[in-house]
């Protein structure tokens, strides 16, 4: 696995709130964008997150502060019963993120 394609994140209270947003590290997302050549328009891009055999479609968006996953994040968060302090990994492979803990 290429570590440049991996996002490791300790979930914050904000990530687990009912705002349904997962804030992502800007440098990691920009590295993936550069490596893949797939731009992230301001209104976002649909991205698949594969969690074992479950697939979640989420909206990866850019804001003035960085990047976040919006629509779809709440479903994955609730399905995995994620809470603040949990460490998650998102590995970009081909055209999707592979989720792990």
Swiss-Prot record:
The keyword Phosphoprotein does not apply. It comes from the Eukaryota. InterPro entries: B3_DNA-bd, B3_domain, DNA-bd_pseudobarrel_sf. One of its GO terms (molecular function) is DNA binding. Residues 7-101 bind DNA. GO terms for cellular component: nucleus. Keywords: DNA-binding, Nucleus, Transcription, Transcription regulation. Its main location: nucleus. It is found in: Nucleus. This is B3 domain-containing protein At1g08985. It comes from Arabidopsis thaliana.
């Amino acid at each position: 696995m290429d570590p440049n394609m991996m996002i490791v994140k300790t979930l914050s209270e904000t990530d687990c709130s009912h705002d349904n947003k997962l804030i992502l590290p800007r440098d990691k997302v920009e590295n993936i964008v550069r490596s893949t050549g797939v731009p992230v328009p301001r209104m976002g891009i649909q991205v698949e997150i594969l969690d074992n055999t479950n697939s979640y479609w989420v909206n990866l968006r850019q804001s003035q502060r960085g990047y976040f996953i919006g629509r779809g994040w709440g479903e994955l968060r609730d399905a995995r019963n994620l809470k603040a302090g949990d460490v998650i990994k998102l590995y970009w492979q081909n055209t999707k993120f592979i989720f792990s803990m």
